[in-house]
């Protein structure tokens, strides 16, 4: 069952401007070390970070809170699976909110898709509740 849906559209040039004005202070406030390491290896750092910004915004909307209720930017981290597929790792208040909205007997899965076409970066997040594996075969 779908627990939450969120989307966000971010202007890459806006993020580039913030990076130019605030540099590492902005980077450290919003992004995890893993996200920053990935962006540092990419040709277009601003586009990479703009997609992650959009993903965090979209995830906060899917959680039903926005960036409120104690959820911070770093509580939501975009990771990439081996094949490059993005996924979202939640910690802190974001993880607590996810646990609170997940029905008993289910586990949450956060689906993430990212795209960019200059000057826009977009993210879409769907939070799904899946039956626990132990109960999947019972009816």
Swiss-Prot record:
Any GO MF annotation of the entry: magnesium ion binding
Cellular compartment(s): Cytoplasm
Reaction catalysed by this enzyme: apo-[ACP] + CoA = holo-[ACP] + adenosine 3',5'-bisphosphate + H(+)
Cofactor(s), by name: Mg(2+)
Pfam family, one: ACPS
GO-annotated biological processes: fatty acid biosynthetic process
Database matches in SUPFAM superfamilies: 4'-phosphopantetheinyl transferase
One Gene Ontology cellular component: cytoplasm
Positions bound to Mg(2+): 8, 57
Keyword list, A-Z: Cytoplasm, Fatty acid biosynthesis, Fatty acid metabolism, Lipid biosynthesis, Lipid metabolism, Magnesium, Metal-binding, Transferase
Disulphide bridges: none
EC number(s) stated in the UniProt entry for this protein: 2.7.8.7
InterPro entries: 4-PPantetheinyl_Trfase_dom (IPR008278), 4-PPantetheinyl_Trfase_dom_sf (IPR037143), ACPS (IPR002582), Ppantetheine-prot_Trfase_dom (IPR004568)
Similarity comment: family membership: Belongs to the P-Pant transferase superfamily. AcpS family.
Function: Transfers the 4'-phosphopantetheine moiety from coenzyme A to a Ser of acyl-carrier-protein.
Protein name: Holo-[acyl-carrier-protein] synthase
């Amino acid at each position: 069952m779908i627990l939450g849906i969120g989307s966000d559209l971010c202007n890459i040039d806006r993020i580039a401007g913030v990076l130019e004005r605030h540099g590492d202070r902005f980077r450290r406030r919003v992004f995890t070390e893993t996200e920053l390491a990935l962006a540092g290896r990419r040709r277009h750092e601003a586009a990479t970070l703009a997609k992650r910004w959009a993903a965090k915004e979209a995830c906060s909307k899917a959680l039903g809170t926005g960036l409120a209720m104690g959820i911070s930017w770093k509580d939501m981290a975009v990771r990439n699976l081996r094949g490059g597929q993005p996924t979202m790792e939640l910690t802190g208040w974001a993880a607590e909110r996810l646990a609170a909205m997940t029905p008993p007997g289910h586990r949450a899965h956060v689906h993430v898709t990212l795209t960019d076409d200059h000057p826009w970066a977009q993210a879409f997040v769907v939070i799904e509740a899946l039956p626990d594996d132990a109960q999947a075969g019972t009816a």
